[in-house]
């Protein structure tokens, strides 16, 4: 989990230190890697062995910033997340589709990346 109200324990900088100690560790960082600390997710986590999910992010972040994170980190390291039961799957999917990614990018984020990560694709 990343970027909670108590940022001290879920800040991107802290996760980066863990990744420095365990470079082969693969991590999924919720909320595009930072929730309320998206600039730090770009600064400390982009390009690392981290997958970001989209849960509880797209309603709170503007399209330009979310696209910057997705494109800079790489669509192959982004996972769709709804944060159900907090938000409905349908609403989160609609928010995601409004980003305007290509069909190929959508397929990766909506399932193929997770399948590859979990070893089923």
Regions found by a protein language model. Give the residues of each.
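Catalytic pocket-lining loop regions of alpha/beta-barrel enzymes
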Residues: 1-79
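C-terminal active-site rim and adjoining tail of enzyme catalytic domains
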Residues: 81-84
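Mid-to-C-terminal alpha-helical segments outside catalytic/metal-binding sites
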Residues: 72-79, 89-121
